[in-house]
């Protein structure tokens, strides 16, 4: 929840309409003036001490290098000039080599965040310049692919951002996708911009996604109100292929994993309720949120093309409010003003044959999604077999990063995770699987969670994802 005001839905929409009539967005020149207003003090005059992030391990269970020193004062004049020149130079399709090197020699570790952001816009010749500046500023070299290595380190080091970082990042990221501006322009958002990166695709801002409408620039396209068939009509889908099963008010539906890997977002109606079902393929996390109980307003969710620590960054297309994919909590825009947190229901990950046998009246998304599209059996083709492809920072070493867990919140709101493989084996052996008052029961090859016989929302995810968004999680062990 948020301490910002809580207007009615009418107030939400009125604010949205006012925002749409705002004038041109502040540009790079304004950034330079804002940074200059901070003064030209030497950032090293009040610097945090270097320290070793003791106990923090990367995804290969190796320790991170010593945390670099970070300035606590205003940025120095030469650094301000360098920062102010970078976006305009990139806009001219030139790479600002001298400015990047000046940042690398600044001695202020806070600017490592900016260098990492800049890496996504660097030319082939510019990448080594950014890498060298990052190594100079951090005092630590690295070998191999720089994108995840740099990202993992700055996430683990958890350095503060430099002054006016949101605006600095805005100037870079709007060169990629100008339609992200409303996210950056909400000064009171709950977004930690340090954790936000580009996922390599553009925003899905299509007002309708029911007939295969395309994104001209390329996006991860949501699917609205997909066509469905009965279970017999789902004979096209192999029995051993996975579905994400949802039951609402006694009505069951299966969402084939291969279709969800293409769309990553389905807005649907099931059991008389409106649902949004995001699937973050990077986190292996399919979740189901009710979107019809927001004070009479129904958000329509889309994929932004951004990521937040390797998790999908979704948003409501009507109000352009960002919503935390893992928690359902609005983190920007009018929905944050209204204190909106979407309620969840359980998603069961199950083989289609087992789901169909347990839920004989189930429906399943049509083979063509209702939009005449052909879906390959395995769209990702083993993409994640070698580990996370985006930075995840420090990891909880209790499990491997890609071990699958079922995550829930207990009655006190404490996160609890159950390793799926071990939990299934225990249940098959007739053992009880419970922790913190939460008990698991099998469902068609998947799992459901209960407290005192009352079902609670649950979903599966990779361990790295669940543990980083729920760092205080309790872990069940067999």
Could you say what each language-model-derived stretch is?
Residues 43-48:
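Boundary at the C-terminal end of the N-terminal hydrophobic targeting segment
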Residues 96-102, 129-134:
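Conserved hydrophobic register position within alpha-solenoid helical repeats
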Residues 4-26:
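Bacterial N-terminal signal peptides that target proteins for export
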Residues 91-94:
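HEAT-repeat alpha-solenoid elements in large eukaryotic scaffold proteins
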Residues 53-59, 73, 77-89, 112-478:
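Mid-to-C-terminal functional-domain signal that highlights helix-capping/loop sites
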Residues 35-37:
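C-terminal motif of bacterial Sec signal peptides marking the signal peptidase cleavage site
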